[in-house]
Amino acid sequence: MANLAQPAAKELAGHPLVVIPARMASTRLPGKPLADICGTPMIVQVWRRAMEAGVGRVVVAAAEKEIADAVREAGGEAVLTDPDLPSGSDRVWQAVCEVDPEGHHTVILNVQGDLPTLDPALIRTAYEALVRPGADISTLAATITVEEERTNPNVVKAVASFGEGRLARALYFTRATAPWGEGPLYHHIGLYGYRREALARFVALPPSPLEVREKLEQLRALEAGMAIEVALVDTVPLGVDTPADLEKARAALARRSV
């Protein structure tokens, strides 16, 4: 197996800290962090992808001891968090405060714990978008190429004006088909970068009206006047939410190991 020790290279600006929130509770796939993918728990597969990104320290924010144990057994770093926290962002922030109370890490990257086939380059892309002047938060989006996704409310759209570039400021996020008219639509990818102070402010804010209406946490930041930089990438990573998704992830990683 490849050496996945923490990178020894010179630290990037902001001393990035990658945090992977994970909990056992899942409506459609209970216990999914420990689901076996090619002989390895899914959360360990995600941890490996984050390590392969090479942006800095990686910590799993575990809601349960079983998750933390699996990560530590694989050689990773994990911290236990309150299982009753309301969101992944709150879990990330609690982990940040636990592992870095002195504030050494001023850039935080939030990688979902159900992305075992994630291209590590996407983590670096989120970092690069965040360190642009004026950005409080960064995230990713990809052009929608499947017609059904344009009207699917489970496919969240990032509304931004990319023009000829690959970076744009987020104007809105919605489950609706937006913007109206001819032109591309963008599938939002829930991988985030935060300035540390922006994450602290975000989790301290109450849920906002549009956040509650759309059931999209990132709208809280927009309603509070925070700037979200969106980087356009080529593909949407596979999120494992169902048994069918799990089989797709197993097949994809099995092909990689051949």
Curated annotation (Swiss-Prot):
It holds the Pfam family CTP_transf_3. Pathway: Nucleotide-sugar biosynthesis; CMP-3-deoxy-D-manno-octulosonate biosynthesis; CMP-3-deoxy-D-manno-octulosonate from 3-deoxy-D-manno-octulosonate and CTP: step 1/1; Bacterial outer membrane biogenesis; lipopolysaccharide biosynthesis. GO terms for molecular function: 3-deoxy-manno-octulosonate cytidylyltransferase activity. Its EC number is 2.7.7.38. One of its GO terms (biological process) is CMP-keto-3-deoxy-D-manno-octulosonic acid biosynthetic process. It is an enzyme of class 2 (transferase). InterPro entries: Cytidylyl_trans, KdsB, Nucleotide-diphossugar_trans. It is found in: Cytoplasm. One of its GO terms (cellular component) is cytosol. Keywords: Cytoplasm, Lipopolysaccharide biosynthesis, Nucleotidyltransferase, Transferase. Its main location: cytoplasm. It catalyses: 3-deoxy-alpha-D-manno-oct-2-ulosonate + CTP = CMP-3-deoxy-beta-D-manno-octulosonate + diphosphate. Gene3D superfamilies: Spore Coat Polysaccharide Biosynthesis Protein SpsA, Chain A. It comes from the Bacteria. NCBIfam families: kdsB (TIGR00466), PRK05450.1-1 (NF003948), PRK05450.1-5 (NF003952). Activates KDO (a required 8-carbon sugar) for incorporation into bacterial lipopolysaccharide in Gram-negative bacteria. HAMAP family: KdsB (MF_00057). Belongs to the KdsB family. This is 3-deoxy-manno-octulosonate cytidylyltransferase. It comes from Parvibaculum lavamentivorans (strain DS-1 / DSM 13023 / NCIMB 13966). The lineage of its organism: Bacteria, Pseudomonadati, Pseudomonadota, Alphaproteobacteria, Hyphomicrobiales.
